[in-house]
Amino acid sequence: MNRPRSLRCLAALAVMALAATACGRSGQGDAPSGSASQAAAGRTAAELLPAQYRQKGVLRVATAVGYPPMEMYEPGTTRLTGVDPDLAKAIAERLKLKLELTNAAFDGLIPGLESGRFDLVMSSMTDSAQRRQAVDFVDYFRTGGVIMTKKGNPQDIKSLADLCGKTVVLAKGSSNLHIGEEQNAKCQEKMRISQSEDAPTGLLQLDSGRAVATIVDYPVAKMFTKKSSAYEVLPRQYGTAPWGIAAAKNQGGLRDAVHKALQELIDNGGYKKILDTWGVGDSAVAAATVNDGQ
């Protein structure tokens, strides 16, 4: 996801990594070794899981709420729900572990992995080359960012170029912020970029007239326009890329077990069922991959 999931959604190298976006393409140099892939072929995800995780019996997964339908609270509660929480639960079950799901600030997710506070991050996080300097990704989703305006598109915005000279709100630390900043570098009359904590707070700036547009991940935009007639979504997606489940660079065994667990869920239909339940089945991947962003 392009997030603060934001972007997202991620100290100096980790924070820089958060701002990157990537167009999906094979990244073979970062993939598991051939021997690891061969070993995984004949073993279940639970069998691939390193002993230290089997002994703990718990899988600690972090997410950053604010990106429905990917991760959010159930209305009136602090119970995490959405695509990523449901998929995290399914992966934990394949690994025969109890899921411990935590909400955290998006820009603290990768540092949390590096410090050992979390085992995995599942938070609409785009698999980008800069982020892969800090973490490995098991890619499970593919989408891009879209421009959202008030209903009727009163500024007649048709593309990123039309944002030049206007006030735009973008989630801090997100890939969508990166998209906006790249466009701003091309603008003769610069955008005035306001940074929000997440997509919902960004939309409040549209509501109040403080901003005329935002860029959010397509599944998020789809959810908001389904729930409210106050917004309009432009059709073009920018920065289309895989989103990944992040694991620390020194946890290759866990990464491989999660890769296998995701493939098992793809094969048995459980993965697609989760995505379809939340209305994002069109962003499904055909196979689980590792470090497949550009």
Task: Annotate each language-model stretch with its function.
Residues 85, 100-111, 155, 193-205, ...:
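Short helix-initiation/N-cap motifs at beta->coil->alpha
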